[in-house]
């Protein structure tokens, strides 16, 4: 809709006549659509399927709507693309829709588009395979001039959880979990990945401030969210400055359990990270009952999260040693 001094003019439905929704149900929000810098285009996320296909498929795409012509373009797949048939009675793993030759068509979950500041690119989070909700989220970059797609986080063997463009339109900042901690990383259009922060914590939302600084939220198993300003350094690691202390007056009155890291050899010979949360005032000479925290899904790793549903500190405060693989 056009907004003038006289008010808001009648809006245009970008999905007029189409039985779909944006943002996508059930968890989608405003992050699934974005305006171009010149305000002439809108990139949005949508899963344009119905019936059985809508029920079993995770294949969403990024669409580009032109406000002048009213035309919509799919950035993930070429015009006229028809996906292979899916046998709903069988696993999606070995079906033709997930053949390696299909990966170029972004057959998985594509979401959260962002235009580059210069308007020449659209980047989004992309999963490779259809029907696999826990697939790795990569960062896909679409060149609006030539239609080329590039995956710029292939050197990072984990999910891209949040991201933002740098002001130069040639690089990004993103968060991702590695060894049970979610830190901030930087990558460029060539796919060179460098770690910016380090430590036992999880960074959540990130946004670019002026002069290349980042505004971010951070928490851990011992501290809920606070806001930080991160200044990326030329030597890969950056400066982290805490700017809010919203719960300090409460935390100062609490005795929290210490958090430890263990690596356990699995039955197939691999090393598995396990977080240990000890009860407050832990005494190594005493015996304690153990509580095994079993992650559901699995849709996400057990990282340094602060949960308001499954809080490790509340469990440990009951006198348990919490073991979280």
State where each predicted segment sits.
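Serine-hydrolase catalytic core recognition
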Residues: 204-325
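Residue-level detector of Asp-centered blade-edge/turn motifs that repeat once per structural unit
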Residues: 37-38, 117-118, 167-168, 209-211
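Hydrophobic beta-strand positions that form the internal "hydrophobic ladder"
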Residues: 42-43, 119-122, 171-172, 196, ...
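Conserved blade-ending motifs and adjacent loop-strand segments that build the rim/top face
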Residues: 152-162, 194-206, 244-255
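A structural motif specific to WD40 beta-propellers
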Residues: 11-12, 73, 150, 194, ...
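Short loop/turn segments that connect beta-strands within beta-propeller blades
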Residues: 3-7, 66-70, 143-147, 187-192, ...
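A flexible loop/linker signature enriched in serine peptidases of the S9 family
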Residues: 1, 15-29, 45-63, 74-111, ...
């Amino acid at each position: 809709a056009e907004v003038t001094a006289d008010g808001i003019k009648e809006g245009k439905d970008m999905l007029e006549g189409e039985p779909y929704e944006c943002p996508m149900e059930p968890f989608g929000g405003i992050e699934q659509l974005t305006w171009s810098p010149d305000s002439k285009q809108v990139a949005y996320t949508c899963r344009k399927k119905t019936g059985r296909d809508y029920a079993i498929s995770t294949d969403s795409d990024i669409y580009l709507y032109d406000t002048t012509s009213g035309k919509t373009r799919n950035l993930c797949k070429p015009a006229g693309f028809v996906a292979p048939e899916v046998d709903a009675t069988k696993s999606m793993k070995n079906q033709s829709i997930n053949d390696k030759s299909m990966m170029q068509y972004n057959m998985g979950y594509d979401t959260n588009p962002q235009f580059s500041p210069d308007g020449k690119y659209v980047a989004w989070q992309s999963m490779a395979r259809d029907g696999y909700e826990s697939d790795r989220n990569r960062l896909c970059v679409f060149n609006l001039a030539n239609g080329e797609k590039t995956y710029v986080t292939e050197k990072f063997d984990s999910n891209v959880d949040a991201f933002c463009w740098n002001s130069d339109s040639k690089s990004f900042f993103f968060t991702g979990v590695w060894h049970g901690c979610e830190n901030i990383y930087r990558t460029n259009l060539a796919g060179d990945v460098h770690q910016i922060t380090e430590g036992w914590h999880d960074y959540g939302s990130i946004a670019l401030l002026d002069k290349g600084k980042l505004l971010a939220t951070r928490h851990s198993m011992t501290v809920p969210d606070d806001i930080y300003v991160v200044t990326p350094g030329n030597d890969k690691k950056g400066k982290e400055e805490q700017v809010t202390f919203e719960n300090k007056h409460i935390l100062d009155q609490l005795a929290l359990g210490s958090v430890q890291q263990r690596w356990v050899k699995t039955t197939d010979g691999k090393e598995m990270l396990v977080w240990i949360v000890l009860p407050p005032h832990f005494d190594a000479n005493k015996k304690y009952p153990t509580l095994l925290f079993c992650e559901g899904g699995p849709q996400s790793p057990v990282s340094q999260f602060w949960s308001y549903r499954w809080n490790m500190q509340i469990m440990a405060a009951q006198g348990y040693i919490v073991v979280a693989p």
